[in-house]
Design a protein with these regions (language model features):
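Short acidic-hydrophobic, aromatic-tinged amphipathic segments that line or gate anion-handling sites
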Residues: 2-8
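Active-site-proximal cofactor/substrate-binding loop regions of enzyme domains
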Residues: 46-61, 66-112
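Classical nucleotidyltransferase
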Residues: 98-212
Length: 275
């Protein structure tokens, strides 16, 4: 996958594209992207995703905390594994936010990114205030030379609270993680939810009582942390993977007041390399 941030330096070839923030790169995203790839192969064109390095709402409101399922780096890595040709990274600026859907399609999709076919997710909207819909995009596409295609809706086999075939969305996955439903979240994501960070110094009280723990500082402060609780986890450290136990919440080994922490206990290996 080629990541293109500056089209003045690299001119993308004509493509079949879709647009989205793709937080989590979940099952619904993957189904949409697979359709893009299939149409691109049939048309003899490149496949492309137009996405944003920063959540659009955070650009407009710096106090907004998006609770990301994937950091920008994690998202790019997951998208690369899917195998699209281009990841077109668009900086969402106040100027971009003011573009109507027609202006966005003309100035960015057609003139900058050379998009020939635009595949729209079943509930996706774009343009100023997201006030226009699929039929508008089709009409604008005919006027400027982009064929707009409605993607097939993704039907899950996931049942939640006795409701079958629940539509998968990033919002649903956030809700599940806030409830501690990590298994259901994994079903929606098609991979186990993960946290990435560095080990930071602690009080080492756990070591004294026979349960040495590593204190984790998550790399991105906007990354969503699941509900407080104890979880069985896989821990990757120094290119090796171990079974572990993760505690999220107030430290059980020491009075840490109201501060929320993440502690992992790796078993059954030596802990000396974590200090």
């Amino acid at each position: 996958m080629q990541i293109i941030r500056d089209t003045s330096a690299i001119n993308p070839e004509p493509s079949v594209a879709t647009i989205g923030f793709f937080d989590g790169v979940h099952a619904g995203h993957r189904y949409l992207i697979q359709q893009v790839k299939e149409i691109a192969a049939a048309k003899g064109l490149r496949s492309a995703l137009v996405t944003f390095p920063v959540h659009p709402r955070k650009v407009m409101n710096t106090n907004y905390r998006p609770e990301l399922l994937t950091t920008p780096e994690e998202k790019i890595s997951l998208l690369a594994d899917i195998g699209v040709d281009y990841c077109l990274m668009l900086d969402f600026t106040p100027e971009v936010s003011r573009l109507t859907a027609r202006e966005f399609m003309t100035q960015l999709l057609k003139e900058r990114y050379q998009v020939k076919y635009l595949v729209i997710g079943y509930d996706h909207r774009f343009g100023h205030n997201r006030s226009e819909g699929f039929e508008d995009y089709v009409r604008y596409g005919k006027e400027i030379g982009i064929e707009v295609i409605r993607a097939k809706a993704y039907t899950s086999n996931i049942e939640i609270e006795n409701v079958p075939n629940v539509p998968v969305s990033s919002s649903l996955i956030r809700k599940l993680l806030h409830q501690g439903e990590v298994d259901l979240a994994a079903d929606c994501l098609k991979y186990e939810y993960f946290l990435d960070g560095i080990v930071v110094g602690g009080y080492q009280v756990g070591r004294k009582i026979g349960f040495p723990t590593a204190n984790l500082s998550v790399d991105d402060p906007d990354k969503l942390i699941p509900a407080d609780g104890v979880y069985a986890v896989w821990v990757t450290f120094d290119k090796k993977t171990y079974m572990g136990m993760l505690n999220i919440g107030v430290r059980p080994t020491i009075d840490n007041g109201p501060n929320r922490t993440i502690e992992v206990n790796i078993l059954p290996v030596s802990y000396t390399h974590l200090t």
